[in-house]
Amino acid sequence: MALGLSQVASQAASQTLDTAMAGSLTRAAGAQAQKIALDTENSILDGQMDSASKSLNSGQKAAKAIQF
């Protein structure tokens, strides 16, 4: 059974939209993955800075406690 012109056009439009949506989802997933990686790296760096600050503060408190 032959398809009418409107059915052919509808199928073509659906395929165009499907392709666009697939590309959009792929790009969004890639961007989200990059954000997760960056957030993780920032969290690690914040933790390292916090640990360094605590270490410095601890050293300063110890130095004050040793004063004669």
From Swiss-Prot:
Entry keyword Secreted: yes
Signal peptide start-end: none
Chief subcellular location: secreted
Subcellular location: Secreted; Fimbrium
Function summary: Major structure protein of the hrp pilus, which is a component of the type III secretion system (T3SS, Hrp secretion system) required for effector protein delivery, parasitism, and pathogenicity. The hrp pilus functions as a conduit for protein delivery into the host cell.
The family this protein is said to belong to: Belongs to the HrpA type 2 family.
Name of this protein: Hrp pili protein HrpA
Annotated source species: Pectobacterium atrosepticum (strain SCRI 1043 / ATCC BAA-672) (Erwinia carotovora subsp. atroseptica)
Lineage: Bacteria, Pseudomonadati, Pseudomonadota, Gammaproteobacteria, Enterobacterales
Gene name linked to the record: hrpA
